[in-house]
UniProtKB/Swiss-Prot annotation:
A GO CC term attached to the entry: nucleus
Name of the protein described by the UniProt record: Developmental pluripotency-associated protein 2
Naturally occurring in which organism (per UniProt): Mus musculus (Mouse)
A Pfam family annotated for this UniProt entry: Dppa2_A
Manganese keyword on record: no
Gene symbol of the encoding locus: Dppa2
Length: 301
């Protein structure tokens, strides 16, 4: 390359370098005109309508001619006369106090007094001293009970006569059944259980005397001039009849459910009943012997 050609090339290169260094670049933001977007508006309207679930406000205006349901509060109307405190509950007394616009505070006795003082001032009522008495209620009247046993238990129906004798009512049929049940129960036992030794320090045999004595089985006064009156003995919860000075037998007869007058001895047995009781025991002894001597039914004669 010639000298002139090289010089012109260098000049051109220097000019280009100067031009690039002298150029100043300025950045200006580009603004585009916003066009109305109908699609976006329709989508927003649809989404807002689907998300809005709030119900419209209820109108509180009552229109004429339309019956609206009303809530009624039940109220207990108090009676014309105040019942006894034992026959009414505390909650009922409070309802009556609310009916009269009275306070319901306090115990049952206090509420009862407050109600009586306000609305039943002229009525006389029994006021218990303690709250326990106020809670107690009188139960129904007890039904009449007819005794079906041997002795006179508590709670049985008793008939008091002018003479002072108390009689427990028992039908003859029931007495017979009770006597047979008693006899059958003792008959199944051995003879040793129906007899026991007589204590030596007791006065079991009574002598003849004037007047009368009370018989337990007959339930009435009988002449005491006969020989054979005995005094019953009580041992191990059972009643025994003296037979000999060393032995006594079980009482198989059913005593009468009659209580004598006060001061009359009621644990005596007349000679006739002593003989009947001994006869029953003798029959048991004979039957037990016959049962032992009897051959089995499957044995040949």
């Amino acid at each position: 390359m010639s000298y002139f050609g090289l010089e012109t090339f260098n000049e051109n290169q220097s000019e280009e370098n100067l031009d690039e260094e002298s150029v100043i670049l300025t950045l200006v933001p580009f603004k585009e005109e916003e066009e109305p977007n109908t699609d976006y508006a329709t989508q927003s309207n649809v989404s807002s309508s689907t998300l809005d679930h709030t119900p419209p406000a209820r109108s509180l205006v009552r229109h004429a001619g339309i019956k609206h349901p009303t809530r009624t509060i039940p109220s207990t109307c108090p009676p014309p006369s105040l019942p006894p405190i034992r026959d009414v509950s505390r909650n009922t007394l409070r309802e009556w106090c609310r009916y009269h616009n009275l306070s319901t505070d306090g115990k049952k006795v206090e509420v009862y007094l407050r109600l009586r003082r306000h609305s039943y001032s002229k009525q006389e009522c029994y006021i218990p001293n303690t709250s326990r008495e106020a809670r107690m209620k009188q139960g129904p009247k007890k039904s009449k009970i007819v005794f079906r046993g041997i002795g006179p238990p508590s709670g049985c129906q008793r008939k008091k006569e002018e003479s002072g004798v108390l009689e427990i009512l028992t039908s003859p049929k029931e007495s017979t059944f009770a006597a047979w049940a008693r006899i059958a129960m003792r008959a199944a036992q051995s003879m040793s259980k129906n007899r026991c030794p007589l204590p030596s320090n007791v006065e079991a045999f009574l002598p003849q005397a004037t007047g009368s004595r009370w018989c337990v089985v007959h339930g009435r006064q009988l002449p005491a001039d006969k020989k054979g009156w005995v005094r019953l003995q009580f041992l191990a919860g059972q009643t025994w009849v003296p037979d000999t000075p060393q032995r006594m037998n079980f009482l198989f007869l059913l005593p009468a459910c009659i209580i004598p007058e006060p001061g009359v001895e009621d644990n005596l047995l007349c000679p006739e009943c002593v003989h009947s009781n001994k006869k029953i025991l003798r029959n048991f002894k004979i039957r037990s012997r016959a049962k032992k001597n009897a051959l089995p039914p499957n044995m040949p004669p």
